A protein has these predicted regions:
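Gly/Gly-Pro- and Ser/Thr-rich, intrinsically disordered tail segments characteristic of DNA damage-repair
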Residues: 1-198
Length: 199
């Protein structure tokens, strides 16, 4: 499709290259600037401290934290979603960074809401994405979700082990965990495969 088999330019932007086959595929070399990332992470963290105490903030990575907002909802007279949005808008106003949030009834559900759910939530007028998840919502929305590697702490190795035993979804794993001792798929299989990590 390239006229005269010559490229007319180059782009590292996938949609642009797909739309225009006469563009050569290019790439960008972006050297890591850890001190810069730490500086911005510190700025965002200082916004959290305007709303919650440090003992309620659990850093997960340079760009992600868990916040136990339980005791603040009544103080601020806000729902979990409203409280998350308040913090996210403060981050945007203070730093110019658009943040997202996952809200859950436990850490795991908050992380799944963030990692999988927030990607499918339309952004509001400020680019904010907030996803909420409780146990029933998890069953409805993610019981049949694939691939397993989308889930927090399920890497390629774990997924391969599970799939080798016919377990392809979280629903499969949940059913396995309640299988009878005489069934092939039962709690013992999960402990045999993963030891204490089966919990």
């Amino acid at each position: 499709n390239t006229p005269g088999r010559q490229f007319t330019g180059a782009s590292s932007h996938d949609p642009e290259v797909r739309r225009n086959p006469s563009l050569a595929l290019d790439y960008i070399v972006a050297p890591p600037r850890m001190a810069h990332y730490i500086d911005w992470s510190t700025r965002v963290y200082s916004v959290y401290l305007k709303h919650v105490a440090p003992e309620d903030i659990y850093p997960y990575s340079i760009d992600e934290v868990f916040i136990d907002a339980t005791s603040y909802l009544q103080t601020y007279h806000l729902s979990a979603r409203e409280f998350a949005r308040k913090i996210i808008l403060d981050i945007l106003q203070t730093t110019g960074i658009t943040a997202a949030a996952g809200i859950g009834t436990n850490l795991y559900l908050a992380k799944v809401a963030m990692d999988i759910g927030a990607k499918h939530v339309p952004a509001d007028e400020y680019g904010v994405r907030i996803a909420e998840l409780d146990e029933m919502g998890y069953r409805r929305s993610f019981w049949t979700h694939r691939p397993l590697t989308d889930f927090w702490r399920v890497g390629k190795g774990y997924a391969a082990k599970l799939e080798a035993h016919g377990l392809y979804t979280m629903g499969d794993i949940a059913r396995c965990s309640i299988g009878q001792p005489t069934d092939y798929h039962n709690e013992e299989l999960l402990y045999k495969l993963f030891g204490v990590n089966a919990e």
